Amino acid sequence: IKAWKSGHTDNDLSVYDLKTKTFWSENIFVERIPSIRASILGWKRNLDEIQKMDIDLIVPGHGSAVKKDVALKPILKYFTRLISQVRKFHQDNVSPQESINSILQREILDSKKVNPEGWALFTEYHYSNITKVYTELEWE
């Protein structure tokens, strides 16, 4: 059992079975967008650490059990993309609302660029994720 530093929430836990190389974690979302409630930077660090572990199967907090790469690659790609976009918005002095509007405009033009993972609940959580990340990265 491992307690993680701030990531998805402020109290994430996981269980790892050495014998079967199975990892249970609420930090991992499969087939649906992650909802950021604590720290995207902390969560990404946690996922990077999980990526280095000798895991065969991940039982996510949200979604079906899958192989490690199937679980981690989409969420890490999304986090990297979101962090990069929001940092650019900060550099260009774009407000949180203007950031969301910019992404909304792109979504209308080409939804595959905005939600390439094809996640469920994307519209419900993506824009709150932008706002959360915007606030977190404001103090970098």
Regions found by a protein language model. Name each.
Residues 4-85:
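Metallo-beta-lactamase
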Residues 92-140:
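C-terminal regulatory/interaction regions
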Residues 85-92:
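Positively charged, polyanion-binding regions of nucleic-acid-associated proteins
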